[in-house]
């Protein structure tokens, strides 16, 4: 998913891109934001896209910096949220070493570290780490590898037990194409590789960048977000992303 991919989504983002904020069943992400928020603190939204989290961040913090590497997406956010006077906007590629120096009290990053290239992910994590002051907090939302595998199990299990014909079988909302790098957490969704993370992988990775993980929770979604024709009888646990609250300790 390069910059050109996201630039083209500026006018169709709401209809084509999954809305984490809207689909968070238990509002766990907002709860995590509330835990670290203060009208005396500064916050950044790294990978803000069209700014869906800005109306939540703006009233809770002293100032907000909205950051994205797609200028068209950033412009859409700025146009939509002109009334949020404590929000500024910055066009930065977070997969390149940042020249800018920041010391935020908190950073929110929602499903932005998706690249299948390890080197680019490493730079992104390093940019996060150096932009948060000591004892500041990172709220990170990230795709769960456990959930991706669990969803495939549920699809297979449901189809087997019900002996469905090919036309009746339940299917994923996105085509799983090349999964030859599944052992690395790379899941190809509609031919686009997305990095997914194990819970323990997240804790270890964040630790290597000077963070101490304080909590890891599930951001639960309905089955309809993952399965196109999900039976109403499909039980919990539901598919999820991970949300991590981590403190910068080094």
Residues covered by each model-derived region:
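Class I SAM-dependent methyltransferase SAM/SAH-binding core
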Residues: 50-96
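Acceptor-substrate binding/catalytic loop of class I
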Residues: 116, 186-201
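Conserved class I S-adenosyl-L-methionine
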Residues: 1-37, 40-47, 139-170
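A short glycine-rich, Lys/Arg-flanked "PGG" loop and its adjoining helix->strand segment in the class I
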Residues: 122-134
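A short acidic, Gly/Pro-enriched loop at the edge of an enzyme's catalytic core
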Residues: 99-107
């Amino acid at each position: 998913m390069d910059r050109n991919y996201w630039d083209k989504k500026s006018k169709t983002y709401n209809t084509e891109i999954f809305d984490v904020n809207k689909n968070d069943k238990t509002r766990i992400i907002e709860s995590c934001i509330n835990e670290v928020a203060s009208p005396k603190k500064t916050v950044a939204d790294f990978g803000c896209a069209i700014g869906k989290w800005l109306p939540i961040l703006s009233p809770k913090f002293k100032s907000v910096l909205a950051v994205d590497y797609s200028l068209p997406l950033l412009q859409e956010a700025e146009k939509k949220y002109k009334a949020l006077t404590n929000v500024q906007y910055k066009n930065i590629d977070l997969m390149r070493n940042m020249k800018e120096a920041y010391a935020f009290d908190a950073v929110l990053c929602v499903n932005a570290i998706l690249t299948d290239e390890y080197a680019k992910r490493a730079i992104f994590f390093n940019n996060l780490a150096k932009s948060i002051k000591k004892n500041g907090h990172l709220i990170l939302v990230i795709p769960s590898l456990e959930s991706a595998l669990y969803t495939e199990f549920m699809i297979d299990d449901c189809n087997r037990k019900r002996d469905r014909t090919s036309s009746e079988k339940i299917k994923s909302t996105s085509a799983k194409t090349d999964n030859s790098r599944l052992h690395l957490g790379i899941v190809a969704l509609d031919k686009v590789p997305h990095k997914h993370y194990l819970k323990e992988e997240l804790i270890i990775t964040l630790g290597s960048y000077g963070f101490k993980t304080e909590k890891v929770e599930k951001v639960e979604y309905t089955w309809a977000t993952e399965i196109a024709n999900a039976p109403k009888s499909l039980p919990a646990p539901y598919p999820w992303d991970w949300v991590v609250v981590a403190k910068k300790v080094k």
